[in-house]
C-alpha cells in the first residue's frame, strides 16, 4: 500500500484562517522588505495567490503601485484556463469550489487575472534580468514556481535575493 502524504501528520487551517494569515503577513512584510518572493505550485496555487494578492491591492491592504511579477511559464499558461472556468461557472451558476473563491468573487477573479488589465506582469528567462534590473531597490512581489527548491526560476531568485536583508521568501 502506497499513500501520498505531502501534508501527512499535519492539521491544516481552514481556508478563511489561512487567507487572513496570508493577508496579514503580506501587508506586514511589504512595509519591511523590497522584494517578496512567493514560491508556489504552478497549477492552482499560483493562480489563487495571484488573485488574492491583486485583491489586496484593490482593497488597499497593500499599495497598488507595487508590481506583481509572475515567473512561471506553466503557471502563466494556466491563467487563461482558470479564467475560462470561472466564466463557465458564472454562466452555469455552479459553485466555484474548484477555484476556492466564492461566487461574488468570480467576476473579480476574471477581471483581475485577465492579462489585458495589466494587474500583473509575466516574466520569463529572457526578460527576467532586465525587469529585475529596472526594479532593483524597488518594492516588488514575485510569484514563481518552486520546483521543490531543486530547479526552476526559484533557483535564480535564491541566488539573487537569499543574502539580501530587504528580501523575504514565502
Show the residue positions of the predicted features.
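Hard-cation-handling environments
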Residues: 23-170
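Metallo-beta-lactamase
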Residues: 1-18, 32
